Every structure is written in structure tokens, then in C-alpha cells.
Amino acid sequence: MTAKYLVSPRGGRRAYRDITSALRAAEVRGRAALIEIAPGHYEEALTVRGEVRLVAAEGPGTVLVSRPRGAVLDAFGTVSVHGLTLAGRGAGMDIVGCHTGSLTLDRTEVRAHDGVAVHARPHTSVTLRDSVVLYGRTVFTGSAGLAERCRFTDAADNAIAALEGARVTVRGSRIEGSRIHGLRVCDAYAEITGCEVTGTGQAAVVADTRGELAVVECAISATHAEGIMFIEQSRGSVDRTRVTDALHGVVTKSGAGPVVRGSVFADCRDTGINVQDAGLGTFEHCRVLGARNVAVFSTKGGAPELRDCHVSGGNVGIAVTDGGRGRFTRVVVEDLTGTALRVYDEGGAAFSHVRVERCPAGLEARGNGGTTAEVTDSVFRDIDMGAVAIDGQSRVTLRNVTAERGGMVGFTVAGEAMLQITDSDITGVSSGGIGALGSGRLVARNVTVTGSEGLGVYGTGTAYVDVTDSTFTDCALAGASFDEKAAGRLADCAVDGTGALAVRHNGLVDLTALRTSLPVVRHKEKPAGPPPQVVQILSDPVFNGPVFNGPVHDVQLAWNNDHVVQQQTEGDGTHP
């Protein structure tokens, strides 16, 4: 049976003037206690032992318990607090601490002007319901925790921290204005569901040091840094969550590998999905909208895998750089102001069933021989400049790739790079279908170019072009053109339609089994120039001087001298 105690600052019959006196009486009796507290301000520190309920008799906000310095409530046992306001300050102090057993804060407000607001110590359990925590952080250390329908405002540190094996659940709550993180999980487990997190100074939600974090149906906005971050071999999941106006939507690095599903990263100020420093991650059915710099970024050993994702608006779609890797399957990239797919500087990417539409450039690859990209079963449509352009020493393979209304060019290679194309189609380009420039190497098998306003295939510089079993139809200027010292072969190919020429070549390309009714022409050889002028200098013991093979004018000569000083005096302009 529960014993009931009344507390009133005015005293009265069977009423205690302070809460501490009622707690002492309850401890002496050793029974479960209900302590009802009349409205007022109680300046005292409460140490609660046993099974005790502290209740504001006239509802939340009517009872204030505070101290100018130090802890306000220390709980040992099974303690619940209903409707009280607990306020205190003190660096390094726990304003409310659960030392043993369990503590429940229901419709309670905790103000921690300095230090920790609520601390659940190891092997304890703390529950907050419909409560408010102001200024201080709520810490779960090796304990169990639950926060439902709470508000955590303006924490000077992390709003909520789960540490050292803690298991914490946060539901339906709002976290706002934290100077560091909204929720930090360090070597612990936390689940945050249906929450709003906004205005944090650093990552809104973060897992580190092998922590495990589950984020479900949350709204994260206006963070100064990352929306969600997994680092230091942490793991977990993000489901049906929206991140808006973060520097980076979600970041994973240093061995972390979350699974992110059905989430949206909108209007991020730098990147939407950022995987770096050996980070991992699987992203399914996600959308990145309006990323200011790069929508999906893999760098420095990062290795994400994206499936069924959508990138729309913003600058660059997917960028894999500086040794990053990535696999991208059934991804749509559209309506960008920059490049859709970028692979630079030893990056390695595999794109499968990717669709790129309405972008200035499709795929760009540039870097040394360790820079590679593979594109299969993909479509580039309405690209302003070129569907695929590679440079440096990079290596790119295209299989069953289509470029429709591809802008200026379809697929081109330059520098010392190598481009291999198989079973692919290009339609509606303005300059050329496939081509090699500089010292680039182009190998194409079963490629079709239709309706080019310029050329079907071309080579310039010292490029090498090897094209077999391909068809070039209705290419306005020529089906194939080879200039300068470009070399290679055109074997078992067909040039047909209404173009002006089948092939215009320089004599360095092997034309084998070419099927065409259009003319094949060779560039005219440039006429030989005049022989170089030679000036002979004869030197022997008898004579040492120049020999002239014709008239010479306006020269200055000196020989047999160890030192020569040349002076020139300007005349009056009357002599040549």
C-alpha cells in the first residue's frame, strides 16, 4: 500500500514545509510513497530513495525545485517525477541523476544552465515523457533510456548522448539548437523515430566508435554541418528520413557502413550523400534534390553502393574522385547545371542501368591509368555537350549504352586515355558520334551512329581508332573522318544514308570490307616546301670563316675572336 505525503511551503495540517522532510519521513516508513507538492518554489536538493512518486499537486509548471549550484535530484530506487520543474547549474554537475534503479520524468521540465541536465548512470533506466530539457545534455552511460514526445532545446553540448553500451530510444521528440550534436551514439545503440532535429552546430545525428544508430521517419533541417553521420566503424540504418538545408546530407567514413533506404536529402549546401576515408554504405530508393555542389560524392577510399536512387537539380550528380569507388545501379540523374557523372584521379565507378537526362555533360573521366569507369545498359538523353568525354590516361568501357539527342558529340576520348565501346547507339548529335583526339585510343564494336549533323566517327592528332561491325547512317559530312596523323582501322562497317561522304581519310587508316555507296576520299597531300637554307662554317688551320652561297645583306660577322662586343647605334632613318 502506498503512503501519501503532502508538501506545502505554507505548512498546514499533516503537511511538510519542504520536500526533503517528506522524503525523510517516507524513507523511515520504508513503504512506497506518493508525495504531492503544492505550488511554490522549493530551493533544496532532493535525494530520493526507494519507491517514490513526486507529483505537482496542481499540474505541470506549478512547482519549481532549484538550487543556485549543484545537483537538484539524485535518485536511488524506483523514482518517478510528475509535473515538476527542476533547475540548477554547475559545471561538471548532474542536475538530475539516476544512480541506481529507474527514474521516470513525466511532464517535467529540467533546466541545466551549466553541466548535465539528466544523467542515467550504468545499469540504470531513465524514461522521459512529454518533458522539456533546456540548455543541458541528457546522457545515458551504460544504461537504458526512453524519451517520448519530449523537447530538447539549446543544449550547450550534445542534446542526447548514448555512451558505453547504453541502449536508448527517442520517439516523437524535437531537438533544437544544440551547439554540438542533437544525438550522439558512441559505442552504444540508439533508435530515433519520428523526431525533428534542427539548428545543430555540428552533425544533427551521429554514430561513432562502433556505435549503432537507427534513424526512422525523422525530419532534420538547418544544421551547420552534417545531417546524419556514421564514422569510426559505426553501423546502423536510416529509413524514410528527410534532411533539408544541411552542409552534407549524410556522411559515412572511417569504416562505417550504414544502410539508407527511402530517404530524401534536399537543398544540401555542399553534398547530399558523402562517402569518404574508407567509408561504406548502401543507399536504396533515396533522392538527392538540389545539392549545391555534388549530389553523391565518393572520395579517398570511400565505396558506396546506390540502387534505385534519384538525383535531380543542383550542380554535379555523382562524383568519384581521389581513389574513391562506387557501384551505381538503376540511378536517375536529371536537370543539373553541371556534369551528371564524374570520375577523376584514380576513382573507380561502375554504372549499370543508369539514366541521365537534361544535363550539360554526361560522363567525364580524367586522371591517370588508375581512373576507371564502366557503364552498361544505360541511357544519356538531351545532353548539351557530350554524353561521354574522357581525358588524361583514364580508361572507360561502355556496353549497351545509348546517347539520344546527345548535343555536340556522343562518346569521345582525348589525351592518352582509352575508350572501349560495345553494342551502343548514338542519335541526333551535332558534331560527331564517336571520336578520338590527341593520343587517345578508341576501340568500338557494333556501334550505330544515326543522324549526326557532322561526322559518324572521327580521329585527329595521333589518335588510334579501331572500329568494327559498326554502322553510320545519315551523317551529314562524312561517316568517318581521319585527320592529321590519326591511324587505325575501319573494318566490316557500313556507311549509308544521305551523307556527303562515306570516309575522308589521311591514308593511315585501314579500310577493310567497307559497305557504302558514298564516296571515299583521301586528303590532298600538302605540297613540299622550299629546301632549307644551309650556312656552312668551314674550320681548318688555314682558313676559319663563313662561306656564302649567294648574296648576303645586313649581317654582322666576327670570327677568330675569343671575345666579341656588339654595339648598335640608331641612325637618322635615312639608311636601310
Give the residues covered by each predicted segment.
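Right-handed parallel beta-helix
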Residues: 58, 80-88, 102-112, 125-136, ...
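Short glycine/acidic-rich loop motifs that flank beta-strands on beta-rich extracellular proteins
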Residues: 42-46, 66-70, 89-94, 114-119, ...
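Right-handed parallel beta-helix/beta-solenoid
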Residues: 1-24, 28
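Extracellular beta-strand-rich solenoid/capping regions of secreted or surface-exposed proteins
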Residues: 42-55, 63-103, 114-123
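Extracellular beta-strand repeat scaffolds in secreted/surface proteins
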Residues: 33-37, 54-56, 492
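Extended, small-residue-rich solenoid/repeat segments and analogous flexible loops
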Residues: 64, 106, 129-130, 239, ...
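Long, low-complexity intrinsically disordered regions enriched in small/polar
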Residues: 500-576
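Beta-strand repeat architectures
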Residues: 23-33, 59, 75-79
